């Protein structure tokens, strides 16, 4: 398969699942949205590391162009819905006590946040 075709297919997969992810993100709390999208993701292929990185780049490219700009929680939910490996990983939601713009972050996997910041509270799902 050509690289261009692979990118086009990945774009199509992300765009196809985006409405379902966005509906869950906007209407359900994480307690319900994450398990719902994990069930979907567990039925998807488990990507190798390089394919998973390509998926993240595709998700980020689409996410950045959506109304309101990029959203880390939406990116996490998209990855969980599209990859069996991501569906098995911990979803972390970090918040700062002071609140305000950019006072929270969502990421996948063990350990500290992927943005290098520290959060007062981290909820793990």
Predicted regions and their residues:
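Hydrophobic/aromatic-rich core segments of domains that either
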Residues: 58, 77-125
């Amino acid at each position: 398969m050509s690289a261009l075709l692979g990118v086009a297919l990945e774009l199509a997969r992300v765009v196809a699942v985006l409405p379902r992810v966005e509906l869950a993100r906007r209407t359900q709390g994480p307690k319900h949205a994450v398990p719902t999208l994990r069930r979907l993701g567990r039925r998807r292929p488990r990507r190798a590391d390089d394919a998973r990185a390509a998926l993240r780049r595709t998700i980020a490219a689409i996410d950045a162009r959506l109304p309101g700009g990029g959203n880390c929680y939406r990116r996490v939910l998209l990855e969980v819905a599209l990859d069996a490996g991501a569906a098995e990983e911990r979803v972390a939601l970090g918040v700062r006590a002071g609140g305000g713009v950019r006072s929270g972050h969502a990421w996948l996997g063990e350990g500290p946040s992927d943005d290098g910041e520290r959060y007062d509270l981290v909820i793990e799902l």
